[in-house]
Amino acid sequence: MANFPDKQYDSNNPYNIMITLSPFDVDRSTTIMMPKALLETNLFPFMEISTLVQLLQVQDKPKMIGVYDIDTQITTYVIIRQDGNNFKFHGWNDILKRKHYKAGDTIAFWWDLRHTRLNFKHVA
């Protein structure tokens, strides 16, 4: 099996998902929410079709995906589930234990096609 390099953060990537953390996202939260419209534009076009079908059509069966911290090189597996016009990523608290983010911090997320995971980095 080939060993591919991690897809690094590129501030010029138009498909970055920029999330400014709210107090809810950092105050003992187990989830982080992302708007469905943002994911439809910047994430879903790159995901495998079977994953999309499971996320969008089989809502009682959420999907587990890897979320990779590009700085620490740690992958955390989270459950992604649709909640109205948002998607919730359950398991976010495992990342918070290591990262100590504050409300107002901006996190960039981007899809890594070669590793089929969502990479992230604290950018502001």
Swiss-Prot record:
Keywords: DNA-binding, Nucleus, Transcription, Transcription regulation. The keyword Nucleus applies. Its main location: nucleus. GO terms for molecular function: DNA binding. GO terms for cellular component: nucleus. The gene is ARF46. InterPro entries: B3_domain, DNA-bd_pseudobarrel_sf. It is found in: Nucleus. The keyword DNA-binding applies. Coiled coil: none annotated. Residues 32-124 bind DNA. This is B3 domain-containing protein At4g05630.
